[in-house]
Amino acid sequence: MTLINEPQSRVFFALTCSPALRKMVSQWRASLSLRTGKPVPSANFHLTLLFLGAVDKAKIAEICSAASKIMVPEKPLTLVLDRLEVWRKSKALVLTPEDAPPELMRLSYALEQAMLRFGQDQEHREFRPHLTLARDYQSTVPEAGIPPDFFLRADRFGLYQSHKGQYT
């Protein structure tokens, strides 16, 4: 008996950042003069809505079809990234919102519910909106000369594939 291994991709749903936001956040991060961690390339800035993990490539079209049925808010989502935090367990330096809009929380939940039928073995994690600035970060929260105050606006979400250190 031969086992057929279908190629898999590590995928996640996310809101992308505009080029202008990427540039502003990248310049602000540079002002922090980080001495530890690996900065996330600004081209990879995003806000993950739901991480699916390893998925058979054959299921991607079906996953996209299920996600396309999710109602998105009539107005673009606006999220204020105004807090700088260190997440010790994941060793990440992140920007987070003090208050996440209810529409964003509902969108993440709707995606999670829509993906249940695909039987992904994903451990349930509470959705914590964030933009990762650096990985392998092992220090305290750096002092910012100018406090973070960035507006992420999005009117759609997408399915992204992750590679080691990259997103496509």
Regions inferred by a protein language model and the residue ranges of each:
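Histidine-dependent nucleotide/RNA phosphoesterase domain, centered on the 2H-phosphoesterase fold
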Residues: M1-T168
